[in-house]
From Swiss-Prot:
The keyword Transferase applies. Signal peptide: none annotated. Its EC number is 2.7.7.38. GO terms for molecular function: 3-deoxy-manno-octulosonate cytidylyltransferase activity. Belongs to the KdsB family. It is found in: Cytoplasm. This is 3-deoxy-manno-octulosonate cytidylyltransferase. Keywords: Cytoplasm, Lipopolysaccharide biosynthesis, Nucleotidyltransferase, Transferase. It comes from Salmonella paratyphi A (strain AKU_12601). CDD domains: CMP-KDO-Synthetase (cd02517). GO terms for biological process: CMP-keto-3-deoxy-D-manno-octulosonic acid biosynthetic process; lipopolysaccharide biosynthetic process. It catalyses: 3-deoxy-alpha-D-manno-oct-2-ulosonate + CTP = CMP-3-deoxy-beta-D-manno-octulosonate + diphosphate. GO terms for cellular component: cytosol.
Length: 248
């Protein structure tokens, strides 16, 4: 099947300045992400960035770049600018791969594209089971609850669903109901155009989760269990050191 990967790569990260260009075992991080995307079989891969140094690193690795504005409030807004500049048709399948995921398995990039293509829905994503209490109660691990057809009912930083009887006895173990959302999305290009036309929702401001805008406006997001679990993403300097060690 045909799909396009867009990799947003913002230079000015608040916790790790110049994050796309940090060195991981001899290559900029953004080049590692580009290589994982190439392994997915995508028809086209575009790095969307607001910084010339990132663009030069990508082009030196043979990648395609789309220069975007620096004032976007979200990664989806950056995607929308690329969609318009490239003139993608409304039914084009777009996969948003985060620029700080150098260990993302190529198989899940393709999985989210295929899941979207098989359904009459504008957006799809992935999740993995949560097995540890530490992760279940960590607000940085976003949880998702699904309906019977695999569509998201809600995303939250809180522990959902709350296993009342189990947690009344102990907070040391979790059951099989908790799923951690992975930050990879598939969209149809026309859906991205609609998304950025909507006003931000109160829930997304409360949780700081932009995907809640979709549910707020009554749209569906399909969620499948990922075929592989991504490695560590890079948000902090400590994450960077872990990734360097894991990728040696």
């Amino acid at each position: 099947m045909s799909f396009v990967v867009i990799i947003p790569a913002r230079f000015s990260s608040t916790r790790l300045l110049g994050k796309p260009l940090v060195d991981i075992n001899g290559k900029p991080m953004i080049v590692h992400v580009l290589e994982r995307a190439r392994e997915s079989g995508a028809e086209r891969i575009i790095v969307a960035t607001d910084h010339e140094d990132v663009a030069r690193a990508v082009e030196a690795a043979g990648g395609e770049v789309c220069m975007t504005r620096a004032d976007h409030q979200s990664g989806t807004e950056r995607l929308a600018e690329v969609v318009e500049k490239c003139g993608f048709s409304d039914d084009t399948v777009i996969v948003n791969v985060q620029g700080d995921e150098p260990m993302i398995p190529a198989v899940i990039i393709r999985q989210v594209a295929e899941n979207l293509a098989q359904r009459q829905v504008g957006m799809a994503t992935l999740a993995v089971p949560i097995h540890s209490a530490e992760e279940a109660f960590n607000p940085n691990a976003v949880k998702v609850v699904l309906d019977a057809e695999g569509y998201a009912l809600y995303f939250s930083r809180a522990t959902i669903p709350w296993d009342r009887d189990r947690f009344a006895k102990s907070l040391e173990t979790v059951g099989d109901a908790c799923l951690r959302h992975l930050g990879i999305y598939g969209y149809r290009a026309g859906f991205i155009r609609r998304y950025v036309s909507w006003q931000p929702s109160p829930l997304e401001h409360i949780e700081m989760l932009e995907q809640l805008r979709v549910l707020w406006y009554g749209e569906k997001i399909h969620v499948a269990v990922a075929k592989a679990v991504p490695g560590t993403g890079v948000d902090t300097a400590d994450d960077l050191e872990r990734v360097r060690a894991e990728m040696r």
